[in-house]
Regions:
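N-terminal alpha-helical transmembrane segments of multi-pass membrane transport
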Residues: 1-74, 84-91, 102, 398, ...
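Extracellular loop-to-transmembrane helix junctions
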Residues: 6-42, 85-123, 305-313, 349, ...
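Transmembrane helix-loop junctions in multi-pass membrane proteins
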Residues: 17, 31-36, 75-80, 89, ...
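Flexible loop linkers connecting adjacent transmembrane helices
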Residues: 34-59, 82-92, 96, 104-137, ...
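Helix-loop-helix module between adjacent transmembrane segments
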Residues: 27-29, 98-123, 129-193, 354-364
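Membrane-interface loop-to-helix entry segments
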Residues: 20-27, 31-44, 164-170, 176-238, ...
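Extracellular/periplasmic helix-exit of transmembrane alpha-helices
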Residues: 29, 107-117, 220-236, 244, ...
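Alpha-helical membrane segments and immediately flanking helix-loop junctions
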Residues: 54-85, 112-130, 134, 151, ...
């Protein structure tokens, strides 16, 4: 069975997903007028605006922190380690490329989610890919298919991957029994997810910035302490990225392929651009300024923080400790722990264990919120179905600590590809709407006015929207 999963992965990620992700990212980069570069100077202002509370939804900052909670998981640690193990230091460069290109894709999917959001019976905004497939494309069957993929991925598999990383870290540092790890983590997860969307969002708006700052500051201090090695480490990333070192031996093509494949895979698992997960958090926000593009820009910040800051920090630690080769026999998170033990002394591995627990716990909780959101689309938002999902998440967390690492990542990669193919197909079909959103936002910015989305200006789009999602805005 592992060989079968490996074969499926090689087909999907050997060519299909790489071309699709790269092509979609380039398309939306051009279609939105290089949105990730145009508004990069606005990131600070967008973060400031994101704190404004608005009726009917989360603040944009709460939405960002919820999406970051899902993004900033073991993929930022174990995923980076796996990418370097399989693809060499050059995988880091391709993670950067995937992140920059993915920012445009994320802008597209999150803007669409914000545009096609609707209110539930409690007045809370709900939305995501399933909604824009149903409303924007008129293909509810496609939305149902995506929602099922997401429930499998975020309700089951991805939480198991995060739990697996926690177990690996605790086993390496303290020889902790896997079953005990799983039960404790599952209990804390259950306590958190019963708080609901608003409760989780309030928890994450304080929790996520704190854990990210701890990891990044620690990494910066270590980099400064080893500043003499940094030029060599940075050069090794670029040298390996293009196969220059292996060219003389005739292995450049294979090495380049491995670097690109693993860089794109791990970047996507970490920042989730194009996968269709982040739009579930983006749609829950009452955006400020009241324009879909504003939420798209805020969520681009999440990719910048996740991959270009946190993942890069993890990569630097691994490469500083062993130039990407010394500890290759170790798997995933244990490679990071060994690197930190080399760089920080005996307590380095224990510090990584703490960080992994924080990252993985926040990710599991946010994963559940995404899955629960799609129960609403499937009209299964009754107490029985919700508690069934909670129990399933509880069991998956325990099970994740007992399964092997390669199997967990193979399953994650396959379901991630299924989600991405469905979502990317939808947003590419909706690219004229994305272009309209980006152009409308830019037009108002050039006029020097606060961007406000008015559905009456675009009647073809307005007819597709939920009646009460943008009514207040159009009346301003």
């Amino acid at each position: 069975m592992p060989d079968f999963f490996s074969f499926i992965n090689s087909v999907l990620w050997g060519s299909v997903m790489i071309y699709l992700l790269f092509g979609a990212g380039c398309w939306f980069t051009f279609r939105t007028g290089f949105v990730q570069f145009r508004y990069i100077r606005q990131f600070g202002k967008s973060l400031k605006n994101s704190i404004h509370p608005q009726p009917g939804g989360l603040t944009s900052f709460q939405s960002l922190c919820t999406s970051l909670a899902a993004r900033v998981g073991s993929g930022n640690l174990a995923g980076v380690a796996l990418a370097i193990t399989a693809g060499g230091p050059g995988a880091v460069f391709w993670m950067w490329v995937a992140a920059f290109i993915g920012m445009a894709t994320s802008f597209a999917e999150c803007s669409l989610a914000q545009l096609y959001k609707e209110r539930d019976v409690n007045g809370q905004f709900r939305g995501g890919p399933a909604w824009y497939m149903a409303r924007g494309l008129g293909m509810r069957w496609m939305g149902v298919l995506f929602a099922v993929f997401l429930l499998i991925a975020y309700g089951i598999i991805f939480s198991g991957v995060q739990a697996n990383a926690v177990d690996r870290a605790l086993s390496f540092s303290f020889d902790f029994p896997p079953l005990v790890t799983g039960i404790i983590l599952a209990v804390f997860t259950l306590l958190a997810i019963t708080r609901g969307l608003h409760g989780v969002a309030r928890l994450m708006q304080g929790f996520v910035p704190l854990m990210a700052i701890i990891w990044v500051l620690t990494s910066l201090v270590i980099c400064v302490m080893n500043i003499g090695q940094l030029p060599h480490v940075i050069w090794s990333i670029f040298e390996s990225a293009f196969g220059w070192q292996e060219a003389a031996g005739g292995a450049a093509g294979y090495t380049l392929s491995q670097a690109i494949t693993n860089g794109f895979q791990r970047s996507m698992f970490s920042n989730e651009a194009g996968m269709g997960s982040t739009p579930n958090a983006a749609a829950a926000a009452a955006s400020w300024p009241p324009h879909p593009a504003a939420q798209g820009i805020v969520q681009m910040i999440g990719i910048f923080i996740d991959t270009l800051v946190i993942c890069t920090a993890s990569a630097m630690l691994i490469l500083l400790a062993g130039n990407g080769t010394t500890y290759m026999p170790l798997e995933g998170i244990q490679l990071i722990q060994k690197a930190m033990r080399v760089l920080m002394g005996s307590w380095g591995a224990e510090f990584v264990t703490l960080v992994v627990i924080l990252f993985a716990f926040s990710s599991i909780v946010a994963n559940y919120i995404y899955a629960e959101n799609n129960l609403f689309f499937l009209r299964l938002n009754n107490p029985k179905a919700i508690w069934c999902l909670r129990i399933c998440t509880f069991a998956t967390v325990i099970g994740g600590t007992l399964l092997s690492l390669p199997l967990m990542w193979q399953l994650a990669d396959i379901i991630m590809a299924c989600m991405a193919i469905t979502n990317l197909t939808a947003i590419l079909l909706l690219s004229p709407v994305v272009h309209t959103i980006a152009s409308d936002y830019l037009r108002q910015r050039k006029l020097g006015v606060r961007p406000v989305f008015d559905p009456l200006r675009y009647p073809d789009i307005g007819r597709q929207l939920s009646p009460d999602a943008w009514d207040d805005v159009s009346q301003e």
